[in-house]
């Protein structure tokens, strides 16, 4: 998947609200949001397709946002890491959790 595809698809798969880094910084500056945990990392379970990887990645993001007591997240980085000799990959996601009005 391309970066645009990931950025367009991931927010549709999460229950938590997706914020761009710029939106997050503006909301913090205007006291509308606060960071709960920065630089959280989640490794999605191995699946058969990138779409399924993204679906389980979204589920992991939502679980961390809920556990942290938030309602929003900021996608910082993601990558598919090759984990076996057959070319199997796992999705690694870096994100911040936030609490917003």
What positions do the PLM features span?
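Short, well-ordered alpha-helical segments
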Residues: 29-81
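Residue-identity detector for threonine
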Residues: 2, 12-14, 20, 50, ...
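Surface-exposed short loop/turn segments
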Residues: 75-101
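Glutamate identity and glutamate-enriched acidic tracts
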Residues: 5, 21-25, 47, 59, ...
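Intrinsic disorder/low-complexity signal
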Residues: 4, 24-25, 52, 67, ...
């Amino acid at each position: 998947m391309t970066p645009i595809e990931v950025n367009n698809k991931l927010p549709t798969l999460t229950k938590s609200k997706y914020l761009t880094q710029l939106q997050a910084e503006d909301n913090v500056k205007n006291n509308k949001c606060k960071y709960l945990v920065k630089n959280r990392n989640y490794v999605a379970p191995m699946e058969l397709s990138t779409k399924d990887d993204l679906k389980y990645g979204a589920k992991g993001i939502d679980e961390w946002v809920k556990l942290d007591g938030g309602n929003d997240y900021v996608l910082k980085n993601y990558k598919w890491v090759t984990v076996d000799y057959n070319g199997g990959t796992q999705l690694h996601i870096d994100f911040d959790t936030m609490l917003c009005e």
